[in-house]
């Protein structure tokens, strides 16, 4: 994690992030718990894929590790994107140049809190649109994450294309996108229980200019 973090929940900040493509906002654990507690039965015997989440620091990954046995998950996969030798979770660390992922099966003595020595590196950057990430997507049953804000429409389109079940937490303004609203109208996707209410905000690295 960055040495310091700040909370951002202002729409102006999110619009700036979309424009500048600095849109990796990290969802707080409390907000994840608040929403996902309504869907616990859907994770039983499922392979869960968090395809926009650093397995070392992601709160989505942490939530599923904490609740792995209770939810009776079959397998958890968490993968993240690394751009231009830049680790999004540590603004001073430029040693990592490839995306990476981690798989957890809930076996006895299996590592559940991976370090940089435990992760598996992609050949590429780990973008959710890459073949490597899509290969992981194909083997998964349900996707849970907070996708990149500037790529929200493309992200949703991919999940629909591969006929994946998903639960994503993001900016409520996304429902105004034509592509997203059409899916809601056709009853192919639904709004969450909280629908943007009661969300504490997002954690962003201190070095981001918001």
Give the location of each predicted region.
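Class I S-adenosyl-L-methionine-dependent methyltransferase catalytic core
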Residues: 1-210
């Amino acid at each position: 994690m960055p040495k310091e973090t700040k909370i951002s929940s202002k729409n102006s900040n999110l619009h700036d992030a979309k424009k500048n493509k600095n849109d990796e906002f990290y969802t707080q654990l409390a907000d994840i718990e608040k929403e996902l507690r309504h869907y616990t039965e859907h994770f039983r015997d499922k392979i869960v894929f968090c395809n926009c989440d650093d397995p070392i620091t992601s709160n989505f990954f942490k939530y599923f590790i904490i609740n792995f046995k209770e939810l009776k998950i079959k397998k958890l996969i968490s993968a993240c994107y690394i751009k231009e030798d830049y680790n999004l979770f540590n603004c001073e660390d430029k040693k990592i140049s490839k995306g990476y992922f981690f798989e957890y099966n809930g076996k006895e003595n299996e590592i559940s809190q991976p370090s940089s020595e435990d992760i598996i590196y992609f050949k590429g950057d780990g973008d959710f649109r890459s073949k490597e990430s899509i290969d992981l997507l194909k083997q998964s049953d349900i996707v849970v994450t907070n996708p990149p804000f500037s790529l929200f429409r493309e992200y949703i389109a991919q999940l629909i294309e591969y006929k994946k079940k998903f639960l994503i937490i993001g900016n409520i303004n996304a429902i105004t996108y034509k592509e997203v609203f059409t899916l809601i109208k056709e009853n192919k996707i639904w709004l969450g229980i909280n629908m943007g209410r009661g969300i504490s905000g997002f954690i962003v690295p201190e070095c981001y200019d918001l």
